[in-house]
Design a protein with these regions (language model features):
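Residues lining the SAM
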Residues: 106-108
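Conserved class I S-adenosyl-L-methionine
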Residues: 1-45
Length: 246
């Protein structure tokens, strides 16, 4: 998903507190679970760079990778004056991307790969780009979130210069949903709003499928938690947080 128009309103509709929680989760995991000192971090599907800039503030050497040119352009503007490397790349392949001590993939970005073979390709690419003892962190929506919460879900966000309407629908494939996003953005003359629509599909697979795939690729010390790694997974946990070590 390239997030064409969505990129321009992404930061305004995202819960900023989540960025703090992802950052804290990453730093805790680097310290407690990696089998090597973590100095260099790569974030896949980095979006507009909010987590990366927080990691940069904490002294990590960081690299941001995203498929969306629009997202990266916004991230680069926000991060002017910082020594952050930004790369446009497909996380299933990661050609010409350096190895790092840690790789993160947050904000349920892995759910946008609806074919499990693509998920495995990401695991393989990450494994190849981690130093020995490096750690891989990612999260996905839980099956409870996908099957019980999202169907029929609506979210509206309105400002003076734009309106954002999000509606979610259950799809036929178990664990899959479609998000229909309508955006009304005020034009420069201030008199008219232009309408854009994007349709995003997400898919979550059972925990065991992720665990087996990680193990087959070669990862060890695989753990799955909820609440940003601070509690055990429950039936109603909204997200699953995975960590795996090379």
């Amino acid at each position: 998903m390239n997030y064409q128009k969505f990129a321009h309103v992404y930061d305004q509709v995202m819960d900023q507190q989540l960025y703090e929680e992802w950052t804290d989760y990453a730093v805790r995991s680097f310290s407690h679970s990696a089998k090597r000192p973590v100095r260099k971090v790569m974030e896949l599907a980095c979006g507009t760079g909010e987590v990366l800039m927080r990691l940069d503030d904490k002294g990590y050497e960081v690299i941001g990778v995203d498929l969306s040119k629009n997202m990266l352009e916004i991230a680069e503007k926000k991060a002017q004056g910082r020594s952050i490397e930004w790369l446009q790349a497909d996380m299933r392949v990661l050609d010409d991307v350096p190895t790092t001590d840690a790789v993160t993939l947050f904000s349920d970005s892995l759910c946008y790969l609806t074919d499990f073979e693509d998920v495995v390709s990401v695991f393989e690419a990450v494994y190849d780009h981690l130093e020995e003892g490096g750690i891989f962190l990612f999260d996905v929506h839980s099956l409870y979130q996908m099957q019980e919460v999202f169907p029929g879900y609506q979210y509206h966000f309105v400002e003076d210069d734009f309106a954002f309407l999000w509606q979610s629908y259950e799809l036929d494939e178990p664990g899959s949903v479609e998000h229909v996003i309508d955006m009304y953005i005020k034009q420069e003359d201030g008199n008219l709003f232009e309408h854009f629509q994007e349709v995003h599909e997400e898919q979550t697979f059972p925990i065991e499928m992720y665990e087996v795939a990680l193990e087959m690729v070669g990862f060890t010390n695989i753990k799955v938690k909820a609440d940003f790694g601070q509690s055990e997974v429950q039936e109603t946990s909204p997200r699953w947080f995975f960590q795996a070590v090379k």
